[in-house]
Amino acid sequence: MSEGDSNKTHFGYKTVEADKKADLVASVFHSVAAKYDIMNDVMSFGIHRFWKRFTIETAAARPGMKVLDLAGGTGDLTAKFSHLVGERGQVVLADINDSMLKVGRTKLRDKGIVNNVSYVQANAEALPFPDNHFDIITIAFGLRNVTDKDAALRSMLRVLKPGGKLLVLEFSKPQHEMMRKAYDLYSFKILPKMGEIITKDADSYEYLAESIRMHPDQDTLKEMMQTAGFEQVDYTNMTDGIVALHKGYKF
């Protein structure tokens, strides 16, 4: 099923009306928002911090830059970017889900991160920002939840400055058969049980496992970014490709 040319799309393994997916995804994140950070640590054994640190290092944000942390959720990347861009810079934490935004805003304010961060509820497919506005855009573990990924990539390209870079951190396809088998066992047997114990919501973590399997693999996403207009697109696999960081530029 191709992106953007059908009235149907995937919600995990289910086929749903395209205009219903956003609401279904929203219900997932409304349910898990309060325990989102805890679950990230538990289900990744803390490795998500390494993946995000590598993303920050690759972004190479400098003082005075404008950064969009799209699908930024509870603000892990925003907190780091806020320090790097300094008082002359700006970080926008954007998320389509208001529950996630509230958790992120509260967490960052409790850490004293207030002066150079703003919060916007936004749909990645139609970003409410001017053309050529941001130096860096990141979207971490969010693209797979977007209904029309092609439209979202084009929207990101539009608001990125010439010379700017997009970083897409997302679950992807393990490179070795033994890892794939172990990952499938973990994802479909263990992860939902963790979700039930910690968040009282196994279904949302079943969706997580399914949505990862339905997301474009490394080379397909690279092609999608190139088709959207990004240049010098490449990717780095982490943890045998369980996660990949894609990078592309606007020239």
Swiss-Prot record:
Record field: catalytic activity = a 2-demethylmenaquinol + S-adenosyl-L-methionine = a menaquinol + S-adenosyl-L-homocysteine + H(+); a 2-methoxy-6-(all-trans-polyprenyl)benzene-1,4-diol + S-adenosyl-L-methionine = a 5-methoxy-2-methyl-3-(all-trans-polyprenyl)benzene-1,4-diol + S-adenosyl-L-homocysteine + H(+)
Name the InterPro entries for this protein. SAM-dependent_MTases_sf, UbiE/COQ5_MeTrFase, UbiE/COQ5_MeTrFase_CS
- UniProt-annotated binding residues for S-adenosyl-L-methionine: 74, 95, 123-124
Example of a GO biological process term: methylation
| Pathway field | Quinol/quinone metabolism; menaquinone biosynthesis; menaquinol from 1,4-dihydroxy-2-naphthoate: step 2/2; Cofactor biosynthesis; ubiquinone biosynthesis
Its Enzyme Commission number(s) read 2.1.1.163, 2.1.1.201
First-level EC class = transferase
Checking NCBIfam families in the record gives: MenG_MenH_UbiE, PRK00216.1-1, PRK00216.1-3, PRK00216.1-5
What task does this protein carry out?
Methyltransferase required for the conversion of demethylmenaquinol (DMKH2) to menaquinol (MKH2) and the conversion of 2-polyprenyl-6-methoxy-1,4-benzoquinol (DDMQH2) to 2-polyprenyl-3-methyl-6-methoxy-1,4-benzoquinol (DMQH2).
PANTHER family recorded: 2-METHOXY-6-POLYPRENYL-1,4-BENZOQUINOL METHYLASE, MITOCHONDRIAL, METHYLTRANSFERASE
Q: Which family does it belong to?
A: Belongs to the class I-like SAM-binding methyltransferase superfamily. MenG/UbiE family.
Protein name, entry field: Ubiquinone/menaquinone biosynthesis C-methyltransferase UbiE
Report the source organism.
Shewanella denitrificans (strain OS217 / ATCC BAA-1090 / DSM 15013)
| Gene, per the UniProt record | ubiE
